[in-house]
Amino acid sequence: MKKILLAVLSVIVLLVLFVVCAYTMKWTKITNITDGIKDQIIGKKEEKKKETSEEKIRVATTIKAVESLVKAVGKDKVEIEKVVPDGTEIHEFEPKAQDILKLSNAKMFVYNGDELETWADKAVESVKNKNLKVVELAKGLDKLDVKENDILDDDKDDEHKDKEHDHADDDHKKEKKHEDKDEKKEGHHHHHDGKDPHTWLSLKNAKKYVEKIKESLIEVDSKNKEFYGKNAKQVTEEIDKLYNEYSEKFAKSTKKNFVIGHPALAYLANEFGLKQLSVEDVFGEGTPTIAKMKALVEYCKKHNVKGILTESTANKDVINTVSRETGAKVLPVYIMEDPAESLEYVEAMKKNLETIYGNLN
């Protein structure tokens, strides 16, 4: 009887232990699930908090040069919104509703200047964003007057100087005739009037752009002041290094004139004591006359022109014709107007300077 009772008690104890273990395991599982859900909720909150604290500054930009310098200073703290679509001719661009919307959604709008983005003021006025920080980079800079520097006129100037002492009266008549011709020419090419808008193609101006971008970013995002300052210092040092290197090189160069299609490099040329001569006016709106082409070929041979510079995104047909007739190579330069251009500012300017120097020496 005792044995039977002991066996029954043993079974009861085992059942109790089994129930207790099962309950404990179930509670532990429930606790783990609850803790997991709790951790997920807390994790998401922390992640959201982190995202909010590291929210990028949305910056609307126009040309490639502006975009590139903004990225150089802002790096991963900025998000670029291209107001001007890739492949668009900036001189002909007029913003549509979707382009204006990009300004409305931005914290900053950075553009070159009113000589280039003639539509900027009206676009800003129409934007429903009172907190938009507008930065005109070229504002306050000393701007160059547009000079045609037509390649054939340059040759005539040389001849004029050689014969000046023998033909004063004839030269006066030719000069008057030449001025009249220039007036007609300026009437045809309205885009040559006023100030040269290509201010970013000066390394000295680029440093001023960087400073203005840095100060503007700090104004809208003061907590990252040191970050922007460090990046601005780095890109400024890169620009200084490039300027110093080519100042020495061009100072030793005996040739100072280079031939280009569209005369966009006046600021760069002025900075290094060079002169750009354009073939743009030789062609006008199409194929040049036989007389002009002959004069151009003679000029290139006389001055040993080894290459003709042209914008990397330009139509090559016209320049290729000149190259074929003169034997000069077609050499790409980077104007950095089209947002689609791949090279960043310092790299593009380095290639431009390498190309010009190699062409002159």
Can you say where each PLM-predicted feature lies in the sequence?
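Extracytoplasmic metal-acquisition and chelation regions
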Residues: 4-361
